[in-house]
Amino acid sequence: MKTLSKSRFVSGIQCDKKIWFDFYRKDLKLPTDDQTQTVFDLGHRIGILAQEMFPNGKDATPENYSDLKPSIENSKKWISEKVETIYEATFSAKNAFCMLDILHRNGDEVWAIEVKSSTSVKDYHFTDASLQYFVMKNAGFAPDRFFMMYINNQYVKQGELTSEIFTLTDITEQVLANQEWVEENLDRLSKMLEIEQEPVAEIGGHCSSPFGCDYAHHCWKHIPENSVFELRAGRNKPWNLYEQNILRIEEIPVDFPLTHFQNLQRNGLKNDETYMDQFAIKNIISRWEFPLYFFDFETIFPAIPVLDVTRPYQQVPFQYSLHILEEDGKLTHKEFLANPEDFSNGENPLKQMVEKFKKDFGDKGNIVTYNQSFEILRLKELAQRFPEDADFLYSLVERVVDLLPVFQGGYCYFPAMKNSASIKAVLPAIAPDFTYENLEVQDGGAASSLFYQSIENGNFTDENLRENLLKYCERDTLAMVIIYQFLVKKIS
C-alpha cells in the first residue's frame, strides 16, 4: 500500500492522474519554476514567523524525509511529556502521514494549528486539515481543537511584528464533519494506486483549480496553439467548443456567440486581420494635454511587511520611471529607485519618492499610465500616508489618463496580441525590434522579487542590480511613448 502525505492526498482530490503521476511518472514533472519556488519560500518564511508567535517549542522536523520514524517517536514522547508547543509534530496512520505546523497545549486543551500564507480560509484548506485530523486521531492523538492560522491583511506594522499579524480561526466543526469523506477518499486513492495503470481522467477546470498542475503540459499536449482555451475572458465558452471537438479559435463557427474582443481574435487568426477604430482611439487620446508624462510604478507586496505603516500584501512602490513628451516631440526621462536599506533602517523611502515627484512633475499636462487604477491607488495611498502632501498627490491623480482601454476595449487589435492587451503583448506588434529580451530584468514580477530579495538579504550595494532595475522600468515607459506615437500617426 502506498503511504500518502497531506500534499499527495490534496493532489488526489484534485485529480486521480495527478497523484498517480506523483508515484509512477515523476519523469513527466517539470522543474520547479521561479514563481513556484517563490511561493514555497514564502510559505517557509511565514511558517517560521508563526512559530515565533508560539516560542520555545520542540522541533520535530524530520532530518531525513524518507525516514519519518524518529520524528514520529519524538512527537509521541513530547506529547506524553505534555510539552507546551511542538513544531512539525509528525503522525502516521491508515496509510497516511502528516506533519502539523504547530501543536500547542493551551491549558487542558491540545490545539492543532495549520499555518497558511493566504489572508482567509479557503475551501481547499479544509481538505488538508481534515486529512491531518484523521491521521492524528487514528494515531491516537486527536486534538481538542483545530485552527487555521493565516495572514491578517488589516494588520499595520509598527516596529517589531506582533502576533496580530496572524488570524486564528477555529475550523474544528468543519474538520470533524469531513472525517467520513476523508476515509472514503483515502481508501479509494490507496486502491487506485495499487494498480500500475494510468487512470482515465479528462482535462477540465480541475487542471488549474485549486492549484496549477505539474503535469498539465502532458495531459494537454493534444491542445494546439491558438486554441479555444486562449479566448480572452472565455469562461465556459472554451469547454462548450471543446465538447464539440472545436479546438482552434479560427475554427469557431460564425454563429457562435463571441464578445467583440473574441471576434477580433478569431478574425485575426483566420484572416490575419488587424482592427483599428480610429474614431474611438482619437476620442480617447486627442484630449490629452501636453506635456505628457508617461508614468509607471514598480512595487513590492510582501506578505510580511518590511516597512512601518504598511499591511501584509500591500503594494508598496519602490521605483518609478517617467518619460516626459513635449508637444514639439522633445522627450526627457526622469526616474527614482529607492535604496533597499531604507526599508529597514528607519528612513522613509516613500517620502523620498514623493519629494522626487515634486521635482519631476510639472503643474500641467496629463499623466499617461497603462492600467490607471494601479497608479491611482498607489498615489491615493501615498496621500493617505502623508497628509501634508495630499493636495499635491491628489492633483496628480486628477491628471491621470490611461492607454490600456485602447487595446483592452478592442479599439486597436493585432493578431500577435492573442488574448492579451498588456504592454508586452502590444509592443511586439507595433515595434517588433523594441523588445525586453536584451534586459536582465524582463518583467515586473522579477523586478519586485529581486528588490524584495535585496531587502531580505541585506544586499544594499549591488550596483548591477540597481542598473538592471532602472533599465527595465525605463523600458516600460518608453514602450508607452512608442505605442502612443504609433496611435497618433494612425489617427492623424
Q: Over which residues does each language-model region extend?
A:
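Flexible loop/turn segments at secondary-structure boundaries
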Residues: 28, 120-121, 155-156, 259, ...
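Conserved DEDDh/DEDDy metal-dependent 3′-5′ exonuclease domain
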Residues: 83-89, 93, 97-101, 112-115, ...
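Conserved RNase H-like, two-metal-ion catalytic cores of nucleic-acid enzymes
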Residues: 91, 280-361
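Metal-dependent nuclease catalytic cores that hydrolyze phosphodiester bonds in DNA/RNA
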Residues: 1-108, 233, 237-274
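A residue-level signal for conserved active-site and pocket-lining positions in enzyme catalytic cores
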Residues: 15, 102, 132, 213, ...
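Acidic, Mg2+-coordinating catalytic module of metal-dependent nucleases/exonucleases
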Residues: 157-225, 244, 426-492
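Short acidic-glycine loop/turn motifs at beta-strand connectors
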Residues: 105-109, 145, 222, 325-329
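Cys/His-rich finger/ribbon microdomains and the adjacent scaffold used
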Residues: 2, 8, 12, 36-39, ...
